[in-house]
Amino acid sequence: MQVLTKRYPKNCLLKVMDRYSAVVRNMEQVVMIPSLLRDVELSGSGGSVQDGAPDLYTYFTMLKSICVEVDHGLLPREEWQAKVAGNEGSEAENEAAETEEAEEDRLSEELDLEAQFHLHFSSLHHILTHLTQKAQEVTQKYQEMTGQVL
């Protein structure tokens, strides 16, 4: 596993982001054959995935995708929306979404910006910590599957 070289305070978001990136890079180095992760559940006895539950491969690709954005910044809004929507959706849906977003923007300006910042900051910290744990679990599960457990 890669060692963090920068020193940040314990609960600093930059430290959480660096740790997440390091754990995902380690996961990418350990998982040599990602296709082995298909149809394997994250928790449990290593059985096949139940209906609707994400498999290890889904986690693997999601964690890598998020890491790219953490390391290199956000995609432009249009690209992100196209990626999420899978390039499917009508113009009417897009216009409705833009109208709803404009209303949300107006309301958000009226709210306390410091409170919004704190909410989003703490949520991001929590989510990145959770994703880091998931990346460690995917790595550990892959090592168990391939007999690489140290």
UniProtKB/Swiss-Prot annotation:
The modification Phosphoserine is found at residue 90. Keywords: Cytoplasm, Lipid biosynthesis, Lipid metabolism, Nucleus, Phosphoprotein, Transcription, Transcription regulation. Highly expressed in liver, lactating mammary gland, epididymal, retroperitoneal and brown fat. Mainly expressed in tissues that synthesize triglycerides. Induction: The mRNA levels in rat liver are up-regulated in response to thyroid hormone (T3) and a carbohydrate-rich diet. Up-regulated in liver at the time of weaning, when pups switch from a high-fat milk diet to having to synthesize their own fatty acids. Down-regulated by fasting. Levels of mRNA increase within 20 minutes of T3 administration. The keyword rRNA-binding does not apply. One of its GO terms (molecular function) is identical protein binding. GO terms for cellular component: cytosol; nucleus. Residues 90-105 have a biased composition (Acidic residues). Plays a role in the regulation of lipogenesis, especially in lactating mammary gland. Important for the biosynthesis of triglycerides with medium-length fatty acid chains. May modulate lipogenesis by interacting with MID1IP1 and preventing its interaction with ACACA. May function as transcriptional coactivator. May modulate the transcription factor activity of THRB. This is Thyroid hormone-inducible hepatic protein. It comes from Rattus norvegicus. The lineage of its organism: Eukaryota, Metazoa, Chordata, Craniata, Vertebrata.
